[in-house]
Amino acid sequence: MNQQTGPVNLKTPQHVGGNGRSLISRTPIWARVVVVLLLTLLASVTCVGTLYAASVSRMATDAQRVLTSAESLANSALGCGSDKSLSDISQELVNATNDLNAELNGPQWDFFRDHSRFGSDITAAREMLASVDTLVNGPFTDLLNLSKRLQGFSLKNGSVDVSALMDMPDIVKQAHKDISQQLTKLNKVPTPSVAKVATVLETEKAALKTVDSMLGEYDGLINLLPQLLGEDGKRTYLVMVQNPAELRSAGGMVGTIAAITADKGTITIGDFATTSGWDIPEEPMDDTVLKERQVFGGTFDQYPATTTIDPEFQRVAQMNKYMWLYQKGNEDENVAGVLSLDPVFLQALLGATGEVKLSDGRVLDSTTTVPFFASDLYTDYPDFEQQNNFVSEAAQAIMNHVLGNANASTASPLLKAIRDTSASGHFKLWMADPDEQEALIATGLIDDKASGELSADSQVPETGIYLSELQQGKQDWYLKTSTTVTKTCGDVSASQNALYSGVLDKRIMTAVRNTQLGQFTEDQLGDEYTVTFTMKNTLTKAKAESLPDFVNGGSENPVLGGMLYRVVLTAPYGGEITAVQADIDSWGTNTASLYDRQYIMFNQQWIEPGKELTIAYTVRVSSDATHPLNVVTTPVVNADGVETGSNGNVTDECTADTNGADGANGADGANGADGANGGADGGKNDAHKDASSDPSAGLDALDKLKSQISCPVDLKSLAGSM
């Protein structure tokens, strides 16, 4: 038998035959053991690596879900708006947190903690996530369950049961307790070895403090909820609908009023009805009314429709409460508050909850509600009784629709609608209990402008221009206004020049009038501003003639389609209106005895169709003013939108080295970026600004985070800035 010698050709067919296998079988045993061990080790490493990679991937996904849902929830809670249902967002946050917690607490991470230098980091991460998990599955889930209880409510016979909200104080109290416990645990966590993990740990502790602080700001309101909802007995809230088709200083004529009652958590909406047949009280509400009559008219307080000639809503609300209680059957009712709405507010509510259909088939929605109330109603239904019926029907239908559709899905847009419209004067609020008023506004969900008052802060000066229609008709849909504010400087003031020349604005024919009252010394007064306010009647004569008599006034108006206004000017708190020029038909009063500021009233001349008139006046603000002058006007609603004054815009004619040059370019700038939201940022936000600007106090993480919270909320940016 021949023996083959030499190398074996592995490329021949015998490599796959029996002899090929025999070659492998002749491989040394130690080599095979090494190969098996290497393959086993490689497989083990691959499996472990795959296991951890998959776990990390799942945690990254879950963490992103937590972040996204928390961000959406914050936007919803702050009224910033969100495109997702509040209940869906809340449930996603619960699910994502539970999934993330379960993954990180898996046995694979026990091994990693015990056999690597990252043990302290794993422990810290677990403790941080455990604290979030405790809160999410504790008070947050309680709130979620509460929202689900509310989600199914419906309006029945004008009533809805929201008594579930009365459980909120206990839930929030538990949240404060849980947060305190979690902060105690996190403070005991050893310092992580990885700097980024240590930073995240500090960020979470700061965030928990912020959440606790923010909840604390809502404590007043939350603890009041049972009281507001009638836990101790029935309460009545009057809802006034003002119509800008017939302007009044505070917004518009009061067309209808309804009583909303809250009793043991059940809210009932009464009928919206006209006030034209109300009985007139025999005595004025109080002694202040006697002073108010000197400015606003001898009988302005005797009819709801004329009370809003007074621009101070807090007084208007009390007068309407007084008159409502005077009506037969209302004497013993407990009126706890008065709310004022206008078509802009109602339209915003429908934008959040959907459209309604009236009995004649007309659809009111986020674009048609304002034109209906301000114009179409009067041209399409010239009969007075029909108009009243449709106003009442529309207001009732909208409020019933909104209350019946207030749920987790609509909560965010509803909150945003209330927040935005209260900031622009279309939703106003007066509460009989000042603590309740303060608690409602302190939440930030209702802007502090909802009180309907001018700034009473001399550092944030505001002057007012208020219009009340005097002629017969509903023509203010056709009024267009523009406002300018100019800061003036020089050796001779603008008011002195105007009084000397008789001219402040060449468009005005009547001479300038000196309105200085001398209630302040020169040292108490600061910068001077010149304000112009132009009103244009956009009607043409042909259009005026085509309108129904109820709109253009018919034969009762000496100028068909003309506009005639009572004008009220108010000085900024601590300041003075020094000179006025206007085409005045009759001069009223100039007094500083009302509401601690100067009030000027006069009746202007007619504005004929196609014509315009201008009012000009000079203002000295207080010497301690730190913001430029803002002008607030009666909201004028027309086809182009809503006009409310200067919105903080100022033209500065002063040089850089003149006194107060920084004023017009102050903290909020002359462009009015913040002025539109309440006179250059006044009110509740000042406290944060003062705190953050104090060089001795410093800026800790909590204050920094809190100051950065604004709409829309961006948690990634907040976390990155810590």
What function would you assign to each model-found segment?
Residues 650, 654-708, 713-718:
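Ser/Thr/Gly/Pro-rich low-complexity, disordered linker/stalk segments of secreted
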Residues 2, 25, 48-645, 654, ...:
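Non-catalytic, solvent-exposed segments at the cell envelope interface
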Residues 6, 13, 511, 656-659:
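N-terminal compositionally biased, intrinsically disordered segments and leader/signal-like regions
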Residues 1-29:
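N-terminal Lys/Arg-rich, disordered targeting/topogenic segments
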Residues 20, 86, 179, 411, ...:
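Short amphipathic alpha-helical segments that mediate assembly, nucleic-acid/protein binding
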Residues 17-22, 28, 116, 696, ...:
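Coil-to-alpha-helix initiation sites in intrinsically disordered, low-complexity, charged segments
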Residues 34-50:
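Hydrophobic membrane-insertion alpha-helices, especially the h-region
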